[in-house]
Amino acid sequence: MLICAIPLSTKPSRLHKIRTREPGGRNVLLNLTKRCRWFEFITPSTLALQPLLELLLQPAANEHRELLQLGLQEALVNAVRHGNGNDPAKLVRIRRIHSPQWLIWQVQDQGPGLQPEQRLALLPDELDAISGRGLFLMHQCFDDVRWSPRGNRVQLAKRR
């Protein structure tokens, strides 16, 4: 159950820098602040994610939709299970930012956060394991993945 979706009239106070993979490495953050649309979604910790995923993916082009859905679902499941410990009283906050050049999602939980060594996106030794591939998949689905210093917010960016 979605608690609220808020269109933000001004940009949030903190947005991590986005790395480009282009030669020359121009500053994409400058472009992001010019013509962006910002939305914030707040939801209780639940694994019933399909309605939320549909809202989050509205600005995504069809050719990227399945890949982005996989990566976002992994981020949301990690926030609910690992960050919030499946506690329905805890909330997950998602920001969706889109510009002509980028689609960006920030997923934040109320947990203690991942330590830097836990954020490595290594493929697990056991490929058929039930879990353990989420961070690896997020890095495969998005052009840029960054963490807040505390480790309880991940930013996922995909170039349009």
Regions from the PLM with identified roles:
Residues 91-101:
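Short beta-strand/loop element within the Bergerat-fold HATPase_c
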Residues 143-152:
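Glycine-rich ATP-binding loops of the HATPase_c
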Residues 2-70:
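Bergerat-fold GHKL ATPase/HATPase_c domain
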Residues 63-88:
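Conserved ATP-binding N-box helix of the HATPase_c
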Residues 106-130:
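Glycine-rich/acidic phosphate-handling loop/turn and adjacent ATP-lid/helix
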Residues 101-105, 152:
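Short beta-strand element(s) in the Bergerat
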Residues 152-160:
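Short C-terminal beta-strand
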Residues 128-142:
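Glycine-rich phosphate-binding loop
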